[in-house]
UniProtKB/Swiss-Prot annotation:
One of its GO terms (molecular function) is toxin activity. Residues 1-10, 18-34 form a propeptide. Keywords: Toxin. The keyword Cytoplasm does not apply. Cyclic heptapeptide that belongs to the MSDIN-like toxin family responsible for a large number of food poisoning cases and deaths. Cycloaminide B is non-toxic to mammals but shows immunosuppressive activity, probably through the inhibition of the action of interleukin-1 and interleukin-2. Belongs to the MSDIN fungal toxin family. This is Cycloamanide B proprotein. Processed by the macrocyclase-peptidase enzyme POPB to yield a cyclic decapeptide. POPB first removes 10 residues from the N-terminus. Conformational trapping of the remaining peptide forces the enzyme to release this intermediate rather than proceed to macrocyclization. The enzyme rebinds the remaining peptide in a different conformation and catalyzes macrocyclization of the N-terminal 7 residues. It comes from Amanita phalloides (Death cap). There is a cross-link at residues 11-17 (Cyclopeptide (Ser-Pro)).
Amino acid sequence: MSDINAARLPSFFFPIPCISDDIEMVLTRGESLC
């Protein structure tokens, strides 16, 4: 089930995988700049 949760996080917040630094900024701002 851990895999499902890990897969949901990126899919729910941002469908496009970005750099870890970008992910933090995206989560903070709530907008994907990819």
